[in-house]
C-alpha cells in the first residue's frame, strides 16, 4: 500500500496486483464430491486445471462432460462476468448434482453456501435454479461456480438472460479470467 502526502491530506492507494484478462474461465477438476463444502476446493488437489476458453460457438457453453465413470468428481470455474448491457440479469444453473454460484465480492472471499447467489446444492437429478442481479455494462464482476457429481447422471450448465437478451448459454465476450492468478 502506498501513502501519498499532499498538504497534510493523506491519500491511501491500495497496492493491487495487475489484472490481465483472458477470454474464458479458469477451470479446475477434482476427484471426489465437494460434500456441499465450498472450502473443499481450497484443500483438494486438482486432477486437471486450465482455461475454458468459452470463445467459439462450440465452447460457449459452460458445461462439464461426464468423467470416465461419471461419478464422484467436482469442478470449479473462476473468473469475471462482464455484462454487455446495464440491466437486471437472470443467472441460471442447471445441474445434477450440487452446484453453487457467487457473483461480486462473495466470489472472491468469504463464500459459503449460505451467501451464494445461486444455491443448487445436494444430491439430485437435473434441477435448474436462478437468481436475478443488477449489473452494469463493462464492469468485470468476480464469478465463482462450483459443481459436484456424486452418482447417477451428471450435468452442469450456466445460462443467463435479461429483458433484452433471450436466455442463452453463449458467454462469448462476457467471461474472462485473470491469467496472472489463474482465476480471480
Label the predicted regions.
Residues 1-2, 145:
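Short, aromatic- and glycine-rich surface loops/edge beta-strands on solvent-exposed regions
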Residues 5, 10-14:
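Interdomain boundary/hinge segments at the C-termini of tandem beta-sandwich modules
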Residues 15-184:
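Acidic/polar, compositionally biased interaction segments
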